[in-house]
Amino acid sequence: MTAEGREALERWQASRPDNAYEVSPHLGRALRTRLEDFARLEPRLHAFGAVVVQTIDPAVRALELEGPQADRTEVRFPAAYAEAGRAVWASGITGAPPFEQAALFYLLSYAGECGHACPVACTAGLVRALRTHASPELCERFLPPLLTHARGSQFLTEAQGGSDVGANVAAAVPDGDIWRITGEKWFCSVADADQFVVTARPAGAPPGTRGIGCFLVPRLLDGRPNGFRIRRLKDKLGTRAMATGEIEFEGALAYPIGAPEDGFRIAAGVLLNTSRWLNAVGSAGLMRRAYLEAAGFASFREAFGQRIEDFPLVRENLAVMRAEEHAALLSTLEVTALVDSSDPDEAAYHRILVNANKFSTSLAATKVARRAIETLGGNGTIEDFSPLPRLYRDAIVFENWEGTHNVLWAQVARDLERYESLEVVLERARGVDDRVDNALDELRERMREVDPLHFRRRLDRYMRALQTALLFREGEEALAELHLRRHVLPGWEPADDSDYRRLLDHCFREEAAVQFAH
């Protein structure tokens, strides 16, 4: 490598942002139009954006290299893990209102999963379940620690069932005023949590999901492990700084969250939906980081006598990444506006969108991370050159958390039929652009037919149409046009589009707020 080449790389590394919020101006713009008290929130976003880059992100690489270790009942982490965790909980993220929680989670995900995003999502779901379904006594005892330092987790999956929770066999037996849980859980993310939410079947309960109860299991009783042991920690492709294990319960003391017969409704409607929503927020934040890494590198890297950002294919790649990450944020904020809504139409829309959006954004995150790696070339595959390999691995795990793609689209198909909500869903994307409306008219008839082979593609096209409409509404005209042409217009061919180069240049140069100091 020449001295000039090494100097360019050093200047790129020195130019990296020191605050995740300051390089996400579109987040602030979007929140400003959705929150009346945004002025109160913005200083906290500035402060947390700095914490993410300066405290949390530097710790992740070491955490992944060393990784969590476990014995029968304890999980051990490097010291930096606890320090980063305290900084995350100090932000107030676990009990914040939806838009505030989403904004903080988006900034946290600048560092990928980072060992703390999944714990936050699980804790936020438990907080919401306690607030909405637990007895006052249970809420008073277990909620306050979750808002300040304690971590929650949710253990639903069993080896024989996977996403088929109705096949679960872990048992719950009443013991006076409490219950005892016995059985094994197969995917236990946040194995170090202070409070476990465990699904189990009460004795005599009916088969399937109707017989599933939802229980809170404290990790410790009087300082001693509460009837559980960790079989092992999983050796995962991604999210390696966070402990995921197999845990066996043997007579663990448990408290019901809500009535036992409502367990699956609470697990799916509160815990899983919270995680799916925040998974999408995390995917959007991860995409933002991937785009910034690629755009920053391309602005410094020179090849064949010019900066690589000036090559048409690199510019196209960056423009596509930017359109995807902006679209993902807006569709996820659309979900955020529906969280906790009691309006029947909004609740029906939320049932559909929280699943469809998780499916769409997690797929997009993997593709954007891969495009970013392509921009860096061979350097993009080196673990200690940039965070991109880690982000890519995390994104693949995000795809598979809280239901595979096929599980999610199947749920959407069932809900559209059960709640007769197709018109409500389509209407949310209408009235912005005739080309989007035409695509929705075509989709209406196709989405009425729930063909298991083709419905997933139809759902994906709907999500792309919705995201395009949201980009237009947000005033992101160039990004909306690019998204429309790539995903919504039938038979569009870039080579036949005389406006395509100008559109790419507009998308690329639009981001004047993010400066890389040359």
Task: Give residue spans per PLM region.
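Extended, charge-enriched "interface" segments that sit outside catalytic cores
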Residues: 1-95, 512-518
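Internal helix-loop-helix
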Residues: 63-149, 189-191, 385, 401, ...
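A glycine-rich, basic-preceded beta-loop-alpha segment at the flavin cofactor/substrate interface
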Residues: 223-227, 231, 246-275, 292-309, ...
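A short core secondary-structure module
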Residues: 178, 182-228
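A short, Trp-centered hydrophobic/proline-enriched beta-strand micro-motif
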Residues: 148-157
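C-terminal helix-coil-helix/basic helical segment that borders enzyme active sites and/or dimer interfaces
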Residues: 326-358, 373-376, 448-453
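C-terminal amphipathic alpha-helical interaction region
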Residues: 428-518
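Alpha-helix capping/hinge segments and adjacent helical runs
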Residues: 7-18, 22-26, 32, 36, ...
